């Protein structure tokens, strides 16, 4: 079969993923809901996964690995949790609504100021523009890894280095990749 209706997360799952989900649904209980084996097994699995994620992302605390229902919820949580009144954020013209909507809401409700690195007609950005847009109140750079609008990939290593060099938070929407 050739599957042509693929969004960021809809591709049909391979059998090992299906097997793992079925196993979890039929053998585990609700985490932290009791002292029975199903609940304890679920808690151990969740904490073990947090430990693996913390190691993978070089995060010093496994309890900082947070699970959400989807990437929109995760992006909203991160964006709304990180930004304070008066902060400045740099994003690109390539962002998905799951980034733009919370940014515009914070612009209206918390006086967060926004700057956007423009994309040309081919969806390419000038990486030097990130540095030119940084101000004393800049708190974060938020960008997509690959645009759902153009399909263009952003060199997040390059953008991350700019953010790191200026002590900024770097938040990547990698939903499309």
Question: Which residue stretches match the model-derived regions?
Answer:
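Pyridoxal 5′-phosphate
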Residues: 1-177
């Amino acid at each position: 079969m050739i599957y042509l209706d693929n969004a960021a997360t809809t591709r049909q799952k391979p059998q090992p993923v299906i097997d793992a989900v079925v196993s979890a649904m039929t053998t585990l209980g609700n985490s932290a809901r009791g002292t029975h084996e199903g609940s304890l097994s679920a808690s151990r699995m969740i904490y073990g996964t947090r430990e693996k994620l913390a190691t993978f992302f070089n995060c010093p605390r496994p309890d900082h690995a947070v699970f959400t229902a989807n990437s929109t919820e995760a992006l909203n949580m991160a964006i709304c949790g990180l930004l304070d009144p008066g902060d400045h954020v740099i994003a690109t013209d390539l962002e998905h609504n799951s980034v733009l909507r919370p940014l515009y809401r914070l612009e209206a409700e918390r006086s967060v100021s926004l700057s956007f690195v423009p994309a040309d007609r081919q969806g390419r950005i000038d990486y030097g523009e990130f540095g030119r847009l940084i101000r004393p109140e800049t708190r974060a750079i938020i960008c997509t890894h690959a645009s759902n609008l153009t399909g263009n990939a952003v060199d997040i290593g390059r953008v991350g280095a700019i953010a790191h060099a200026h002590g900024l938070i770097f938040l990547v929407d990698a939903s499309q990749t």
